[in-house]
Amino acid sequence: MMALKESPSLMVRRTLPAVFALLFSSSVWAGQQTLFSFVRPASVVNVATEDAGMPQYNAEQTAEGEVLRRVVFNPAQRPTLRLSPQSGVWDWSSGKFLTLRLQSAMDWALTVDVTVQGSDGRTLTSRIDLPAGPAQTVMVPLTASSPLSQGMRAGPPMPWLHGGQRLLLTNSAGAVDLKQVASVSLSIPGPKVAQNLLIERVGIQDDDQAYQAAYRELIDAYGQSTRGSWPEKVANDEQLKAAANREQQQLKAWLAERGKQQLDAYGGLLAGPAFAAEGFFRTEKRDGRWYLITPDGHPFYSLGVNAVAADGGRTYTAGREAMFKALPGEGDALAAFYGEGNNDDGNASSQGRNFKKGRWFDFYAANLQRAYGKLCLPAAAGQPAACPPLVVDTGRWQAHALDRLQAWGFNTLGNWSEPALGQAGRMPYTLPLSIVGDYASISTGMDWWGRMPDPFDPRFAMATERAVAIAARDHRDDPWLIGYFADNELAWAAPGSEPRARYGLAYGTLRLTTDVPAKRAFLKQLRDKYRNQEGLSKAWGIELNVWELMEDPGFEAPLPSPEHPEIERDYQHFQQVFAETYFKTISDALKWHAPNHLLLGGRYAVSTPEAVNACAEFCDVLSFNFYTLKPQDGYDFARLAELDKPVLVSEFQFGSRDRGPFWPGPLELAREEDRGPAYANFLTAALQQPMIVGAHWFQYLDQPASGRLLDGENGHLGLVAITDVPYPGFIDAVRKANAQAMAQLRTGLEKKPAP
């Protein structure tokens, strides 16, 4: 490590002349205190480097006329530039943000980690994605902060121009005592070649005016971002109506083409050998390939869309009205689309998020009204104009949505779709089983949508019985229903591959009290195997003086180790029994209440081998949410082949940041134009796996740019924008890919001989 203390005499030698620097340095905002200037350094700060350096004595002028100092971060694990007070600590207690005037000196973006460390060793960290281009002022919040504090998953695009400067707001995590700041460091994680960064100054901002301005008037009257332009962006109602009229003509032509395809009433392929018609959807494996079979006895490849619903455009406005440029006033007709909600549910998905309850506005419904709503009748003599009440015309919307899906080559309504769409008798559909109740639950360390239900608790069986009975009540004899999903993305494990995550269910159970049935079941398993604490202590390599110590809350179980293989075997056995109990409970209830329909698996986001094995035993289909470029990247398909069960991709998605919503979703692509090829490639890869029987896109509609009600997600995920305008390039690519998939399956079936 090299420490550099700049003296006034060195300052003259190492920088450009002071007058020149004053002319070309960027302005300092009101409320900003300069901690250290790399252009005009003072002796009050220690500057140290590790695997980094400042090779030039002089600062340098950029193409824009700014004067900055070059820092070279050499190839190493974490080259670092560190600033610290010459004596004592800094008191930043009056500060709101750490500010840095930075510029990438490369032709590409740089990832820069900022760490603020307190005298007690605690840290506040921030990762800067510094784009190539001119210098910008980076603002790091001095308390943990993210766009969730503004009610949304991802914030507006950065940098943006404010006060004559390019401003880049970052997130921060952790905490420090701002009265006791010991250092601030900049590092670049693991560069393969030397990376050059230009820096002018480091400072403290005492107010949050720039931060508030970044979120002010961010959303326009149509629910779109005000910070960008794109081809489908709507500027006025006339444009909305014109787009709707053009689309209707296109849909008619595409639906006419679909009518020429050789399909049965449910979308099954009229090709190849016959299958038995049993009146409901079922599965069958033939010649090494799994199929869904329609009620009429034809092979069916499920091309679906999740969340085909008209309520996806709602976003909270209460407390953040300034974010919206043109919300309807109380006397405005569109005020009919306000409502009230509360999504403060205590789950991990809502932690750290503000603005999660109160008044919301439904931009999608308002846009439907603008495009398709009935006009007021002219006023008669002495009478006011007759205006129909503003409500979404559900019949028109449902027919339009079904027309779209069929014209675009889809044949299945995925999870969380409007129930009335399935009851229209035009398209097969799926339903969720949402099991809620007062049963015990276990934390695995993830808990995004909540803790794991305890299937050993009799109250879970009662809740399951109730949920299945309600779900099946109006669908028991409906041949259009394919089946039911067993909840969604349960926390079978914690994120990561380390043992504590892999066996999070076992660890979490043993930390609980014996009031929890799952813990009693686990302890019984161990007691039956080892008989007493001596046997368990020897097998696990621990000192357990009395068995009752395991019954205490907070018991910390040992990590698996090669020296004590029984630890891992015991965890695996418990998790296997746990998963079997869970899926058997649901399967038994479904066989009683809905014997004609399929159990479509658990829609895994994270899973364990035990959970997947149990699902294969008790469910008709395994289902996975794959946010990967192809299904094979999401799971070991050699392992799935051993289980010999059909697989449904229950969610997949590709998004970008160039169409309004600020979050691209779990799988980001560079441009909107990349989404279509990615969709086609995913389907091609899915068809290569003979156990995959379908793939469901997530989702129908873009999420609100200001964050959906449930958890603040604000992703560009949709086939359709919040304005109800489809993305034409993506739709065209999706339609062609769906048609190609069906043609490929038809060709394969026609080659197969009759059994």
Q: How should each PLM-predicted stretch be described?
A:
Residues 230-422, 440-477, 564-565, 569-572, ...:
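Active-site-adjacent substrate/metal-binding segments within catalytic domains
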Residues 144-155, 166-176, 182-192, 203-280, ...:
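N-terminal accessory beta-strand-rich subdomains and adjacent acidic, glycine-rich linkers
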Residues 1-12:
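N-terminal secretory signal peptides that target proteins for export/translocation
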Residues 286-288, 294, 300-303, 377, ...:
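Active-site region of glycoside hydrolase catalytic domains
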Residues 658-668, 707-714:
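Histidine/acidic-residue-rich catalytic or RNA/ligand-binding cores of hydrolases
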Residues 31-214:
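Beta-rich carbohydrate-recognition modules and glycan-binding surfaces
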Residues 15-27:
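Bacterial N-terminal signal peptides
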Residues 111-113, 151-153, 196-198, 214, ...:
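Short, solvent-exposed loop/turn and secondary-structure capping segments
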